[in-house]
Amino acid sequence: STHCISSAASDVYKRQGQFGEVHLIVEPYYEGMPVPDMYKFGGQEFKINVKGTEEVPLEWGGKLVFVNSIVGGSIDARFLPAILKGIMSRMEQGPLTGSYARDVRVIVYDGKMHPVDSNEISFMLAGRNAFSEAFKNAGPKILEPIYDVEVFVPSDKMGDVMGDLQGRRAMIMGMSSENGYEKLVAKVPLKEMSSYSTALSSLTGGRASFIMKFASYELVPSDVQDKLIKDFESKQTEE
């Protein structure tokens, strides 16, 4: 999933013998994106003074850009890897629907520590929780894999096959005739292609075939996103 706006959040992790407080900004990232000197959220201004930047390539694609903008040593630099670890764990688990988050910039701009009770676990959990809140408030959008699909079908079955594909949220890209068969070219979300082989065989009496290959990631329609989030939240509640 990816974002459309920037969002700020903070979290205090406090237990007996443990303390960590993290303030951060989460936003979508694209290559070469500059860091502004200041952000404004809810009437508050956040000045940014970049001390260091770490780019983390993600195993599932895209990257996390982690920016240290902590002023006046409010958090020791030794706790930054723990904050990063907490953010990464939440990106991998997926704060929205359990799917990976990618192409995100996180700016840690403030926080607090305790001379005795602060440790790595406190800052890992504070970073994770602050990221979750900011991510959800940033209006994240879910991406889904889209496949190029070519279907070879007898002309008398073309209407049925096309109707079925359109019911699978397909975008029909073109049609042509080849050796007495019609070739139908479409872009279809991978999610909608489950059991397609069986459905196509049933529609055409086994006289059609298809090939598919990955094309791109695209934003899911808002009604589909709402359903995915709702299903994920009810599953979390059950667990």
Which stretches of residues belong to each language-model region?
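Accessory interaction regions appended to the cores of large information-processing enzymes
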Residues: 6-239
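Short, exposed "boundary/linker" segments that immediately precede the start
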Residues: 1-2
